[in-house]
Swiss-Prot record:
This is ATP synthase subunit alpha. It comes from the Bacteria. The gene is atpA. GO terms for molecular function: ADP binding; ATP binding; proton-transporting ATP synthase activity, rotational mechanism. It comes from Exiguobacterium sibiricum (strain DSM 17290 / CCUG 55495 / CIP 109462 / JCM 13490 / 255-15). The keyword ATP-binding applies. Its EC number is 7.1.2.2. One of its GO terms (cellular component) is proton-transporting ATP synthase complex. It is a peripheral membrane protein. Its main location: membrane. Signal peptide: none annotated. It catalyses: ATP + H2O + 4 H(+)(in) = ADP + phosphate + 5 H(+)(out). F-type ATPases have 2 components, CF(1) - the catalytic core - and CF(0) - the membrane proton channel. CF(1) has five subunits: alpha(3), beta(3), gamma(1), delta(1), epsilon(1). CF(0) has three main subunits: a(1), b(2) and c(9-12). The alpha and beta chains form an alternating ring which encloses part of the gamma chain. CF(1) is attached to CF(0) by a central stalk formed by the gamma and epsilon chains, while a peripheral stalk is formed by the delta and b chains. It holds the Pfam family ATP-synt_ab_N. Produces ATP from ADP in the presence of a proton gradient across the membrane. The alpha chain is a regulatory subunit.
């Protein structure tokens, strides 16, 4: 076999032409200290705050403290395999999470990796976890209702799309139940829901996912879970990952609901990280910027103007109180950031009033302008009625001789409390809510025994579906209250068929 010189020279020339003399420069440092999910490294002189860095074993970290001589890095994963002397290099990127339709129905960790065993997530869309909140000119005032399906909320403390409404209360007062019911109620509302579980037990998160699946709500929901067993950096990042995923849909003109369950645990994780990074502690040992931690997160909730697609992102942050103390540091911070709060009281919960909403301490600052007109008409006096009932109830315990007006107020108050009770995972459509509250406030329930109220409501709803579907559809579609005669006739006809308990 003969070797031809011209063929070899042509091949060599082709290879030389393809050769690229590009040089890749990596800034690499060395780990000088490691422990408790925190690493200190020197040699990364030009690293940026919030930049991703990569350790020798492939674990990622986030540069947080930029000090003279070293950098404090929070480790996003298992830190036990990293040791002193290991190399760490800059990536030049900030942290991003995957987003898009591929995540709907999935359970992911704060890094966007699936943890539900259903295979990898294929998506082209990534959003940075930190983003500047929309400015004043990019926003529009909150004017569309977000129906939770919970009578006590939709009537007393209505929530609008783009609002931030805090849900605050002791542990075991039904905070997560409100979140689940709200997600279930969005089935017909064209809303994408993101449930961020921070520091929850894995069994609790599993229970939430199964409840959503059973009620057909997982199809439009993303669950971001940073379990209690996860390292503190993941608990700190989880809410930012959730809102970054939601912003993708908001930018497309869609409506998003993000639930943070709960931010007390995120604040505790941030306190842990800050103390390990040797940042100076402040009140209750929290760092000085813990207010900014929550404000920059919650300010990203917005109702965008029409020019930007009119999308919205509604935030429902949760805060867990200790012995109903809402004047503690983190609760007062978040109350001052949000547009209102729903206060759940443990003594109400244990006395059987569920959802255990305290109407005196609960308020919605912008939701009133988003409330359905029909609901605004029928529920206008509900808050005052409840407040005066609570006051009279306290006085009536001391005396038995009550005048007729006081007695009728007490009777109405008892029925109001009963009507606002609701079973778990049973959200109500707005038309059913309007009709039962109309019946209550206009005195149609005054002659129904208190013990029969819940049964009366259930049977009324079934009767309306069978006999007055048109009336319900009208309220749901227009949001307006039909003529009084129509509703009164419907209630009166049903009352003729209702059998009171003997």
């Amino acid at each position: 076999m003969s070797i031809r010189a011209e063929e070899i020279s042509a091949l060599l020339k082709a290879r030389i032409a393809q050769y690229g003399s590009t040089m890749e420069v990596n800034e690499t440092g060395t780990v000088i200290q490691i422990g408790d999910g925190i690493a200190r490294a020197h040699g990364l002189d030009n690293v940026m705050s919030g930049e991703l860095v990569e350790f020798a074993n492939g674990t990622m970290g986030l540069a947080q403290n930029l000090e003279e001589g070293n950098v404090g890095i929070i480790i996003l994963g298992d830190y036990l395999e990293i040791k002193e002397g290991d190399s760490v290099r800059r990536t030049g990127r900030i942290m991003e999470v995957p987003t898009g339709d591929a995540l709907l129905g999935r359970v992911v960790n704060p890094l966007g990796m699936p943890i539900d065993g259903l295979g990898p997530i294929e998506t082209e869309h990534y959003n940075p976890i930190e983003r500047k909140a929309s400015g004043v000119m990019a926003r529009k005032s909150v004017h569309e209702p977000l129906q939770t399906g919970i009578k006590a909320i939709d009537a007393l403390v209505p929530i609008g799309r783009g609002q931030r409404e805090l849900i605050i209360g002791d542990r075991q007062t039904g905070k997560t139940s409100i979140a689940i019911d709200t997600i279930i109620n969005q089935k017909e509302e064209n809303m994408i829901c993101i449930y961020v579980a921070i520091g929850q037990k894995e069994s609790t998160v599993r229970g939430v996912v199964e409840t959503l699946r059973k009620n057909g709500a997982l199809d439009y929901t993303i669950v971001v879970s940073a379990a209690a067993s996860q390292p503190a950096p993941l608990l700190y990042l989880a809410p930012f990952a959730g809102v970054a995923m939601g912003e993708h849909f908001m930018d497309l003109g869609k409506h998003v609901l993000v639930i943070y369950d709960d931010l007390s645990k995120q604040a505790a994780a941030y306190r842990e990280l800050s103390l390990l990074l040797k940042r100076p502690p402040g009140r209750e040992a929290y760092p000085g910027d813990v207010f900014y931690l929550h404000s920059r997160l919650l300010e990203r909730a917005a109702k965008l103007n029409d020019g930007l697609g009119a999308g919205s992102l509604t935030a429902l942050p949760f805060i867990e109180t200790q012995a109903s103390d809402i004047s503690a540091y983190i609760p007062t911070n978040v109350i001052s950031i949000t547009d209102g709060q729903i206060f759940l009281q443990s003594d109400l919960f244990f006395s059987g009033v569920r959802p255990a909403i305290n109407p005196g301490l609960s308020v919605s600052r912008v939701g009133g302008s988003a409330q359905v007109k029909a609901m605004k008409k029928v529920a206008g006096t509900l808050r005052l009625d409840l407040a005066s009932y609570r006051e009279l109830e306290a006085f009536s315990q001391f005396g038995s001789d009550l005048d007729k007006a006081t007695q009728s107020k007490l009777n109405r108050g008892e029925r109001t409390v009963e009507v606002l009770k609701q079973d778990l995972n049973q959200p109500l459509t707005v038309d059913k809510q309007v009709i039962i509250i109309y019946a209550l406030t206009r005195g149609h329930l005054d002659d129904v025994a208190v013990s029969d109220i819940r049964r009366f409501e259930k049977e009324l709803n079934l009767w309306l579906d069978q006999n007055r579907k048109q009336l319900c559809d009208e309220i749901r579609k227009t949001g307006n209250l039909p003529a009084d005669e129509e509703i009164v006739t419907a209630i009166s006809e049903f009352k003729k068929t209702f059998q009171p308990t003997v």
